[in-house]
Regions:
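Conserved segment of the helicase C-terminal RecA-like domain
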Residues: 100, 135-176
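Conserved interdomain hinge at the start of the Helicase C-terminal
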Residues: 21-68, 209
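A short beta-strand element within the Helicase C-terminal
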Residues: 109-124, 146-149
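Post-DEXD/H (motif II) to motif III coupling segment of the RecA-like Helicase ATP-binding lobe
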Residues: 1-18, 160-169
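Conserved small/polar residues in nucleotide/adenosyl-binding loops
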Residues: 211-216
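Conserved helicase ATPase core of P-loop NTP-dependent helicases/translocases
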Residues: 61-66, 72-104
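Short glycine-/aliphatic-rich beta-strand segments at the starts of folded cytosolic domains
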Residues: 183-197
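Short regulatory helix/loop adjacent to the ATP-binding pocket of P-loop NTPases
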Residues: 1-5, 16, 64, 106, ...
Length: 216
């Protein structure tokens, strides 16, 4: 092909065999059906930690808002956040103050989360290599993991390209039936105290703040 193409493009994708402990599941759904399906799957699997990937900042925030409205503890991570807010989000997710992190690919660069049980592609990535990087965040350090991908009709071509590039047959699943929505509550709560020596704060002040919070 190099003799007939002026500048042939070679696409290299990490072998899916390099991710043997990851189970991949694909669900066909409409755009409107993605949020209800996500809520059902979170209720079904009850992950201790989950990252949901979106392709845009707008979708990232709207998905996060919808999950929180349904009692699923979620945080958003996207480019519109200030660095301080981004850092606080990562700390809260790492210590269990939220069980779901809804993120864009750009904001999630360099994100390293231990024992991540579930990755959800709310939208299929445009680039198959990005898909591999997304799902590769689970099943680390010898652990197993689950990667779930949603596919709306307009994303069918991306699914076909993904199957071809990874040389795998996609595992299409039926939506779960008879699943009751169960709140995905956070295991911990994080207190953000904006003060210190200059504010003349003492350890006892922090303790009293925690006691007051527990009484609310």
């Amino acid at each position: 092909s190099g003799r007939v193409q002026k500048d042939p493009l070679t696409i290299e994708i990490d072998s899916v065999d390099a991710l043997p402990a990851i189970e991949q599941q694909f669900f066909e759904t409409s755009q409107q059906g993605k949020i209800p399906l996500l809520q059902k799957l979170l209720s079904q699997h009850q992950p201790a930690s989950c990252v949901v990937f979106c392709n845009t900042k707008k979708d990232c925030q709207s998905v996060c808002d919808a999950l929180n409205a349904a009692g699923q503890s979620a945080l958003s991570l996207h480019g519109d956040l200030e660095q301080r807010d981004r850092d606080q989000t990562l700390v809260r997710f790492a210590n269990g103050s939220a069980r779901v992190l809804v993120a864009t690919d750009v904001a999630a660069r360099g994100l390293d989360i231990k024992s991540l049980e579930l990755v959800v592609n709310f939208e299929l990535a445009w680039d198959p290599e990005v898909h591999v990087h997304r799902i590769g965040r689970t099943a680390r350090a010898g652990n197993s993991g689950l990667a779930i991908s949603f596919c709306a009709p307009e994303e069918a071509q991306r699914a076909n390209i993904l199957s071809e590039m990874l040389q795998i047959k996609l595992n299409w699943m039926n939506p779960p039936a008879g699943v009751s929505l169960v709140p995905l509550e956070a295991e911990m709560a994080t207190l953000c105290i904006d003060g210190g020596k200059k504010a003349k704060m003492r350890p006892g002040d922090v303790l009293r703040s925690e006691e007051h919070t527990s009484e609310l």
